């Protein structure tokens, strides 16, 4: 098995820590909030408020399940438009009260069903991109599994984008890439090599800003490393004026 194939397998492993796991382990007194105030609550997106070293932080994440029933409840981590609208509601609330935002991303992509399209999936994703680009508080996005397509990007327009070591971030799945390009989904491993989707490759290209090591570390050590990194980064970002924060975020994405 190639290194890319191994990382792809680990990124999709059902035993990985979820967004809710990180929210509860990293932040004290985490309180989950629900609903988009428009249609319904989407179990694929979790969000709420917690404390980090005494500072209130808004946490948003895409949640996969840990077993079949959990995955059915979470729609296998594929958000509907109401999930993205819930995320935006919480982020705008964070802006109103001056709370930084941390997002945890693990999705193969936004849900492509008819109902999701009818309720404005494309609009919901596009609005998140627009609103996050101008959100007047610090944002840190962390890829914790799969970072698939616009469904992931809708929570990743951030001042800093990080990845865990054994995760992926891509425009679509390697299977989808192989099917479109070669009409043969079985060539997914070859596609993954071409796509440059691993954390190390993306760090080298400047797409992400930090890779958090996983191999050889216990779960508690990974959680502590993420917590420390968030604390340090928020301390730096909080020193910037709102104007400088937004300009740096804009220039970060203009580099692409």
Curated annotation (Swiss-Prot):
<keyword id="KW-0547">Nucleotide-binding</keyword>
<dbReference type="InterPro" id="IPR029045">
    <property type="entry name" value="ClpP/crotonase-like_dom_sf"/>
</dbReference>
<comment type="function">
    <text>Component of the acetyl coenzyme A carboxylase (ACC) complex. First, biotin carboxylase catalyzes the carboxylation of biotin on its carrier protein (BCCP) and then the CO(2) group is transferred by the carboxyltransferase to acetyl-CoA to form malonyl-CoA.</text>
</comment>
<dbReference type="GO" id="GO:0016743">
    <property type="term" value="F:carboxyl- or carbamoyltransferase activity"/>
</dbReference>
<dbReference type="GO" id="GO:2001295">
    <property type="term" value="P:malonyl-CoA biosynthetic process"/>
</dbReference>
<keyword id="KW-0276">Fatty acid metabolism</keyword>
<comment type="pathway">
    <text>Lipid metabolism; malonyl-CoA biosynthesis; malonyl-CoA from acetyl-CoA: step 1/1.</text>
</comment>
<dbReference type="InterPro" id="IPR001095">
    <property type="entry name" value="Acetyl_CoA_COase_a_su"/>
</dbReference>
<keyword id="KW-0275">Fatty acid biosynthesis</keyword>
<comment type="subunit">
    <text>Acetyl-CoA carboxylase is a heterohexamer composed of biotin carboxyl carrier protein (AccB), biotin carboxylase (AccC) and two subunits each of ACCase subunit alpha (AccA) and ACCase subunit beta (AccD).</text>
</comment>
<dbReference type="GO" id="GO:0006633">
    <property type="term" value="P:fatty acid biosynthetic process"/>
</dbReference>
<keyword id="KW-0067">ATP-binding</keyword>
<dbReference type="Pfam" id="PF03255">
    <property type="entry name" value="ACCA"/>
</dbReference>
<dbReference type="GO" id="GO:0003989">
    <property type="term" value="F:acetyl-CoA carboxylase activity"/>
</dbReference>
<protein>
    <recommendedName>
        <fullName>Acetyl-coenzyme A carboxylase carboxyl transferase subunit alpha</fullName>
        <ecNumber>2.1.3.15</ecNumber>
    </recommendedName>
</protein>
<keyword id="KW-0444">Lipid biosynthesis</keyword>
<dbReference type="InterPro" id="IPR011763">
    <property type="entry name" value="COA_CT_C"/>
</dbReference>
<keyword id="KW-0443">Lipid metabolism</keyword>
<dbReference type="GO" id="GO:0009317">
    <property type="term" value="C:acetyl-CoA carboxylase complex"/>
</dbReference>
<keyword id="KW-0808">Transferase</keyword>
<dbReference type="GO" id="GO:0005524">
    <property type="term" value="F:ATP binding"/>
</dbReference>
<comment type="similarity">
    <text>Belongs to the AccA family.</text>
</comment>
<keyword id="KW-0963">Cytoplasm</keyword>
<feature type="domain" description="CoA carboxyltransferase C-terminal">
    <location>
        <begin position="1"/>
        <end position="236"/>
    </location>
</feature>
């Amino acid at each position: 098995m190639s290194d890319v194939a191994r990382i792809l397998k680990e990124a999709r492993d059902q035993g990985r820590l979820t967004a809710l796991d990180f929210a509860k382990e990293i932040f004290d007194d985490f309180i989950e909030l629900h609903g988009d105030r428009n249609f319904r609550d989407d179990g694929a997106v979790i969000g709420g408020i917690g404390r980090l070293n005494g500072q209130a932080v808004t946490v948003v994440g895409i949640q996969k399940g840990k077993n079949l029933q959990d995955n059915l409840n979470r729609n296998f981590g594929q958000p509907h438009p109401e999930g993205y609208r819930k995320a935006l509601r919480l982020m705008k609330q964070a802006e109103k009260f001056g709370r930084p935002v941390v997002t945890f991303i693990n999705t193969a992509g936004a849900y492509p069903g008819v109902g999701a399209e009818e309720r404005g999936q494309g609009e919901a994703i596009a609005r998140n991109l627009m609103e996050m680009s101008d959100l007047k508080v610090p944002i840190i996005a962390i890829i914790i599994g799969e970072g698939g397509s616009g469904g992931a990007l809708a929570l990743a327009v951030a001042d800093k984008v990080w990845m865990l070591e054994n995760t992926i971030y891509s425009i679509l799945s390697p299977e989808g890439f192989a099917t479109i390009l070669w009409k043969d989904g079985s060539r997914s491993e070859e596609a993954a090599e071409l796509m440059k989707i691993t954390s190390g490759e993306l760090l080298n290209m400047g797409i992400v800003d930090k890779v958090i090591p996983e191999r050889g570390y216990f779960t508690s050590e990974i959680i502590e490393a993420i917590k420390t990194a968030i604390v340090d980064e928020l301390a730096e970002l909080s020193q910037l004026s709102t104007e400088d924060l937004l300009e740096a975020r804009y220039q970060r994405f203009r580099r692409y």
